[in-house]
Amino acid sequence: MTTREDGRADDELRTVKITRGFTSHPAGSVLVEFGNTRVMCTASVEEGVPRWRKGSGLGWLTAEYAMLPAATHTRSGRESVKGKVGGRTQEISRLIGRSLRACIDLAAIGENTIALDCDVLQADGGTRTAAVTGAYVALVDAVTYLRAADLLSDPQPISCGIAAVSVGVVDGRVRLDLPYEEDSRAEVDMNVVATDTGTLVEIQGTGEGATFPRSTLDKLLDSALAGCEQLFEIQRQALAEPYPGVLPEPKNPEPKKKFGA
């Protein structure tokens, strides 16, 4: 099998690392690394829901994505300074939110909001897929936090795992997990979000420099789903460790029974 510039096989992921408890304040905080792409994903629990959600008894999950100015080779100004959020930033923020809402029962968290913030520290391709994969782990930790605080009506509101990976056609070959060097010249570029139950959440795919047949689409999806299976295992290993911070006490603990009562 032909090797790539970084030495990987076509169907091989970059080295993926997930570090929980990366920062101490949010309920969930993760550093996810796909090779040289590094994204900090946090999950914060906030009381209340958006105005249009009030009175429904349902919670909400929202996401924001951003890149640090020096995340790429050429510094890009902060969008907050420019006073306008770019279209790409909005698109990726919505993708992350949609992807993670697919795995959680929002009725179980009551009228509370889980806010996911994904900040790219260093970009080398696949930032949105790394963000989705890391945000899932941060979300699981946030749910653990809510459970400890006795704020869940269902102790297991997460129904499945969520991971995402990029895949594309480069030099006429289907390749998994594209770094920037490949992504920038791919003939076909695709991002796939999947569940660990074998279903798909979202597919974003375009022919950048060429059209492609249905048979290539099938190969792209097969490669992406195989990659996601590996990511699910990496997530499970990361989550097998204890919660990395201090869990809250229940807000309304049951009164202790008197001895002999």
UniProtKB/Swiss-Prot annotation:
It catalyses: tRNA(n+1) + phosphate = tRNA(n) + a ribonucleoside 5'-diphosphate. Pfam families: RNase_PH, RNase_PH_C. InterPro entries: ExoRNase_PH_dom1, ExoRNase_PH_dom2, ExoRNase_PH_dom2_sf, PNPase/RNase_PH_dom_sf, Ribosomal_Su5_D2-typ_SF, RNase_PH, RNase_PH_bac-type, RNase_PH_CS. One of its GO terms (biological process) is rRNA processing. It is an enzyme of class 2 (transferase). Residues 251-261 have a biased composition (Basic and acidic residues). Homohexameric ring arranged as a trimer of dimers. This is Ribonuclease PH. It comes from Rhodococcus erythropolis (strain PR4 / NBRC 100887). The lineage of its organism: Bacteria, Bacillati, Actinomycetota, Actinomycetes, Mycobacteriales.
